[in-house]
Structure formats: structure tokens, C-alpha cells
């Protein structure tokens, strides 16, 4: 009897050990959840909002309401996958110097009946050693 249980014991111990690993263990090249308050996530979100406003043909700026979800992936640098809520502001885009993130965040919102909220998915690729950040994907609805 004891002999027949031996082959099962080793795989069972391995399975138990794997289940005890912390859930936040990073898988190389895989997506890992990140806290929405993480400073790197915050920087990526600021960049995404600025780029969204620069690329959008809307006449008004959109500001960040909140980061809904954040994940990262270790690539040649770090890629951040962000789900964010943006809200249309009363600040009109004008020719000349575009507003920076902090200025956009200070823009007033229109009255409740006129508010337009977007849910956006952004991918931001950061390569600090090259001093380069890129918005690689963006979709909003």
C-alpha cells in the first residue's frame, strides 16, 4: 500500500508548493497586475492622457478620472496596459502651446447633463535608458 502511494506523493507535494507561491510572482514576459497607485503606472497614465489629447481631433481636452486597471509586461523596457476613464472638460484646445497633464487635470468639467465619459485602453512602452516613451495602442469608447 505504501509503495503505491509514493509516486503520487512527489507530484502532490510539488502542486502544493506551487499553490503556496505568492500570486504576484512575475512571469518573465507575461502580464503582471500593478497597483493603480504605483508611481510608474501613474507616469504611464499621465503620458497616455497627454498623447490621447494630442492625437484626438476633439475640440476639448479630456482629463483622467481614474485608472480602472493596470498591468505591466517586461519587454525591452516595460509595457503598461492601462484601462482608464477620461472625461471631456470645458477647456478648449487652442493653436499654440498645448496644455500639459497637470493643466488638463485642473480643467473644469461641464454640467452633469453635458458630461462625456470615455473608457480607454492604452498600451504605453517605456524604455528609460533611451529616454523614450511611446503610446503603442489606444482605443476608447
Swiss-Prot record:
GO cellular component terms, semicolon-separated: extracellular exosome
SMART domains from the UniProt entry: CY
The species this protein was found in: Oxyuranus scutellatus scutellatus (Australian taipan)
Boundaries of every Cystatin domain copy: 29-129
Tissue expression pattern: Expressed at a low level by the venom gland (at protein level).
Chain location of the short sequence motif Secondary area of contact per the record: 73-77
GO-annotated molecular function: cysteine-type endopeptidase inhibitor activity
Gene3D superfamilies: 3.10.450.10
Protein name per its UniProtKB record: Cystatin
S-S bridge residues: 91-107, 120-140
Protein family: Belongs to the cystatin family.
Function, as annotated: Inhibits various C1 cysteine proteases including cathepsin L, papain and cathepsin B. This protein has no toxic activity and its function in the venom is unknown. It may play a role as a housekeeping or regulatory protein.
Pfam families recorded: Cystatin
Keyword Signal: yes
More info: Negative results: the recombinant protein does not inhibit calpain-1 (CAPN1), a C2 family cysteine protease and legumain (LGMN), a C13 family cysteine protease. Does not provoke cell death (PC3 prostrate cancer cells).
InterPro entries: Cystatin_dom, Cystatin_sf, Prot_inh_cystat_CS
Cellular compartment(s): Secreted
Signal peptide (from-to): 1-26
UniProt keyword list: Disulfide bond, Protease inhibitor, Secreted, Signal, Thiol protease inhibitor
Location (main, coarse): secreted
Residues flagged as site, Reactive site: 29
Amino acid at each position: 500500500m505504501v509503495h503505491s502511494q509514493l509516486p503520487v506523493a512527489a507530484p502532490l507535494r510539488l502542486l502544493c508548493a506551487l499553490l503556496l507561491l505568492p500570486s504576484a510572482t512575475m512571469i518573465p514576459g507575461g502580464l503582471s497586475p500593478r497597483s493603480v497607485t504605483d508611481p510608474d503606472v501613474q507616469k504611464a497614465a499621465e503620458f497616455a492622457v497627454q498623447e490621447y489629447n494630442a492625437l484626438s481631433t476633439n475640440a476639448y481636452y479630456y482629463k483622467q478620472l481614474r485608472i480602472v486597471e493596470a498591468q505591466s509586461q517586461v519587454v525591452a523596457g516595460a509595457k503598461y496596459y492601462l484601462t482608464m476613464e477620461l472625461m471631456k472638460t470645458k477647456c478648449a484646445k487652442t493653436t499654440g502651446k498645448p496644455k500639459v497633464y497637470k493643466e488638463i487635470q485642473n480643467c473644469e468639467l461641464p454640467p452633469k447633463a453635458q458630461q462625456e465619459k470615455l473608457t480607454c485602453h492604452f498600451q504605453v512602452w517605456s524604455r528609460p535608458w533611451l529616454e523614450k516613451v511611446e503610446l503603442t495602442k489606444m482605443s476608447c469608447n
